UniProtKB/Swiss-Prot annotation:
Transmembrane segments: none annotated. The active site is at H88 (proton donor). It comes from Thermoanaerobacter sp. (strain X514). Keywords: Riboflavin biosynthesis, Transferase. This is 6,7-dimethyl-8-ribityllumazine synthase. Its EC number is 2.5.1.78.
Length: 154
């Protein structure tokens, strides 16, 4: 029996990160967490490229462009969509999650969903590096594992 498991080694791998500027006080923390995880696992600065987009809705387009370039072993999508008083939250959260999943399937490049979808700012703050850990860090660890797993299964 053959068992495949992605290793947590970022050395020699290239990563693209797409970050939403909207709710930047949150997304900056997610980015810090992602960079921390990548570097702790051996990624070099020159193997990490970051693209800033205006909002979460724009993440899938740039993530797709990065994935289609085949320059990256994985792409990490970081953003924060916080529920307001209108249905806008639902539209953005749904489209971003569907878009990111579709890119991975279409390009066979792991595109990791690190977009917070929370009901309150407080929930977002907790998930961006306080009591709830840092979801950017977790997304980067997932990217490392998936990049290695994809290489292993080829």
């Amino acid at each position: 029996m053959k068992i495949y498991e992605g290793k947590l080694i970022a050395e020699g791998k290239k990563f693209g990160i797409v970050v939403s500027r909207f709710n930047e006080f949150i997304t900056n923390k997610l980015l810090e967490g992602a960079l921390d995880a990548l570097k702790r696992h051996g990624a070099l600065n020159e193997n990490i490229e970051i693209a800033w987009v205006p909002g979460a809705f724009e993440i899938p387009l740039i993530a797709k462009k990065m994935a289609e370039s085949k320059r990256y072993d994985a792409v990490i999508a970081l953003g924060a969509v916080i529920r307001g008083e209108t249905p806008h939250f639902d539209y953005v959260a749904n489209e971003v999650s569907k878009g990111i999943a579709k890119i991975s399937l279409d390009t066979e490049v792991p595109v990791i969903f690190g977009v917070l979808t929370t009901d309150t700012i407080e929930q977002a703050i907790v998930r961006a590096g306080t009591k709830g850990g840092n979801k950017g860090f977790e997304a980067a660890v997932t990217a490392i594992e998936m990049a290695n797993l994809m290489e292993e299964i080829k």
